[in-house]
Amino acid sequence: MQVTEINAQGLKREFQVLLAAQELEERLTNELSGMKDKVQLKGFRPGKVPVAHLRKVYGRSVMAEVVQNAVNEANRQIVTDNGLKLALEPQVEFPTDQAEVEKALDAKGDLAFKVALEVMPSFELADLSDVSLTKLVAKPSDAEVDEALDRMAGQSRPFTEREEGAEAQSGDRVTIDFVGRIDGEEFQGGKGEGIDLELGSGSFIPGFEDQLVGAKVGDKRLVKVTFPESYGAEHLAGKDAEFDVTVTKIQAAGEAKIDDEFAKSMGMESLEKLREAVSEAIGRDFEAASRRRLKKELLDALDGKYAFELPPSLVAQEFAAVWAQVEQDLKTRGKTFEDEDTTEEKAQAEYRKIAERRVRLGLVLAQVGESADIKVSDEEVNQALIARVRQFPGQEQQVWDFYRKNAQALAELRAPLFEEKVVDHVLGQVKLVEEPVSKEALFADEDGDDTTGGKPADKAEAKDESKTEAKAD
């Protein structure tokens, strides 16, 4: 096998591989000889089938395997001999002349094919000693703890049935049966029986709850609403609907006292212990928000430190994913690019920059992780898998089996674990300055994802919450 590099431009490399007819003949003969003891043909004793006869029966199919094995071998040799890291699977191009291919498959002519590669860029890791980042620190106040307790109490407050003939008021819980119709036809998901609804909670379609205020048990009301343009079910978004609603029960909300008894109902020893637990939970939320802000600032700093050629295939893949989210977002919200004060061409240019940033940061974090020998243990992946499984009650075994049988899905669990370890490592190389802030300041401007630097102003918002996909080896 003769391998010759015929083109090298940037991250693109191209090689020509030549398999001489004699080599094809030898490879085919070796494969057929190895089949003698395995093949049983009528008229021949086991292991006694002549190679010439095997060639007549299986020659073409075995030669196809020979060529495929040679292609795989050539790819490995090219990568190993040239010390390449591939960004894309090798693209193999065979001759277009069918007669030439036929001769090669009969081992009567040479076979030449091309292998096109796209390689990862080579770059030096930047010195981060001059980078200074601000970590925002917020501590839960007594008022924030009180607010959280009030919400908990509101969700736990008792309801008592109103007296006969009483009218439903805002804040009451009504039990209803309903049938919805659009253009006179019932629609999927538009029917319910014995459904509890707290009036004023905003849990139903806008305007639905308001039309039940003043209703009595046994009342039948025709509720007219319009589904929001952003409604999750696309076949209902923006549609006018009518619901025949029957009120079967009305309950008034009582008061839930925030005291030791309330704390015990929440599984805590006392109100003091409950306040401590709530404060700790809020503190964890604050710390997570602080981490997101700090990570965003770190990635911005890293992005400003690097400028190198990016593999076009990786950028194209990332852009396709980002753009699909943009289009889905516009469709869900019933908007156009004109509504967002832009054009499709301008939006594509801006989101391509986002894709490039993500790819660049992914490559940087991957190289940092490799340089620092950062690993993600199987135990850490298992813990992440267990956490994911718990998100699907009743389907735990199916979810577990899916991830265990799907290497790509498991890799997607491993990637963010690897990334967070790399981020921790990089944070250890920069100067951190803590700045006490309020809750409002901590959570301000949290739109956009960490790798993009936020959504472009006045553009359709990309909903992707995934972070830079640094690759874990």
UniProtKB/Swiss-Prot annotation:
Gene3D superfamilies for the chain: 3.10.50.40, Trigger factor ribosome-binding domain, Trigger factor, C-terminal domain
Which Gene Ontology terms of cellular component type are present? cytoplasm
> What's its top-level EC category?
isomerase
GO MF assignments: peptidyl-prolyl cis-trans isomerase activity; protein folding chaperone; ribosome binding
Taking every annotated instance into account, which residue ranges of this chain make up the domain PPIase FKBP-type?
171-256
* Entry keyword Cytoplasm: yes
Which UniProt keyword terms apply here?
Cell cycle, Cell division, Chaperone, Cytoplasm, Isomerase, Rotamase
- Where does this chain mainly localize? cytoplasm
Provide ranges: composition bias, Basic and acidic residues: 456-473
Q: Name one GO biological process term.
A: 'de novo' cotranslational protein folding
Provide the catalytic activity annotation.
[protein]-peptidylproline (omega=180) = [protein]-peptidylproline (omega=0)
Q: Does the keyword Chaperone apply?
A: yes
Disordered as annotated region, ranges: 439-473
Its EC number is 5.2.1.8
UniProt subcellular location: Cytoplasm
Which family is it part of? Belongs to the FKBP-type PPIase family. Tig subfamily.
Function field: Involved in protein export. Acts as a chaperone by maintaining the newly synthesized protein in an open conformation. Functions as a peptidyl-prolyl cis-trans isomerase.
Q: Give the comment on domains.
A: Consists of 3 domains; the N-terminus binds the ribosome, the middle domain has PPIase activity, while the C-terminus has intrinsic chaperone activity on its own.
Official protein name in the record: Trigger factor
Organism in which the protein naturally occurs: Methylobacterium radiotolerans (strain ATCC 27329 / DSM 1819 / JCM 2831 / NBRC 15690 / NCIMB 10815 / 0-1)
